[in-house]
Amino acid sequence: MIHTNRIQLVLAVSLGLALAALGCSSDGDGGTAGTGGAGGTGGGNPPLRILVTNDDGVGSAGIDALVEGLRVNPDNEIIVSAPLINRTSSGDMMTPTPPPLEAMETTTASGYPAAGVDGFPADAVMYALENLYLDEPPHVVLSGINDQQNVGDVDVGVLIRLQVDISGTIGAAKTAACLGIPALASSQGDGEEIDFASGVVEVLEWLEENRAALLAGEVPVDSITNLNIPSCQSGEIRGQLDVPLATENPNGWDLVNGSQNCESTEADLPNDIEGFFNGYVTSSPVPRNKTGTCDELN
């Protein structure tokens, strides 16, 4: 389906990203990394506490685009805690303790304060919960936006692992869910031009649809939501499908580097692989303990 508030979100995101490109957001007015308060809360509504993380690293384009999009809404209270360097394909790996995790105060590419954690994506979540949320936990963890799709529960030939299992973006989200915090993992499709702006629109739309439930603590945490957004080189995103993870890939899509056909007319697409590569945003549940993430935390 095409969501009715997409145009308004596109305009808001475009404005926010344009201001960021002009340097209007580089003054770091969102707060200080390493403190419990960041982001705007001047909208008069209850603030939504959002922890943003990823696996591409705190300086990556995807997390920067997401944070700038979130800042458009003054009711979003944003804290960023992400790996200091690129930790792609680290799944739900965590640094053995002791020693304690280390982090440095840094910023996103547009200058928003962040904690750069010397560790994996799951470590970044743990660091934030233990050091940056001293009073109340976040209402939600947003992991992404990843630079490359994460679709399918099928072997991709990388150490004989499965696509959703090796994703640090998904691993961070599962870690949050295992700790009782709702989480969304978002990934932008590969292509000549990575369309993070469309990814931001879809994440913000998900956030608005779930804002009331997140504030009320009513979003289930037995699974996380895995959102994949096409980067259309031609045509337009066809809509969104709520579909399960694919368990096979009979059409031979290149799951890691394959481009998406947004001009496709294929219908009745049964899973995330078929939906995504035929131009749809796909939303799929991933069990939080799929790879024993929760068991490792207990």
Locations of regions flagged by a protein language model:
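Mobile, glycine-rich extracellular loop/lid and propeptide segments
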Residues: 58, 62-70, 126, 131-133, ...
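Electrostatically charged, flexible surface regions
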Residues: 90, 197-298
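Bacterial N-terminal signal peptides
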Residues: 10-21
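A cross-family phosphate/adenosyl-ligand binding-site feature
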Residues: 46, 50, 68-130
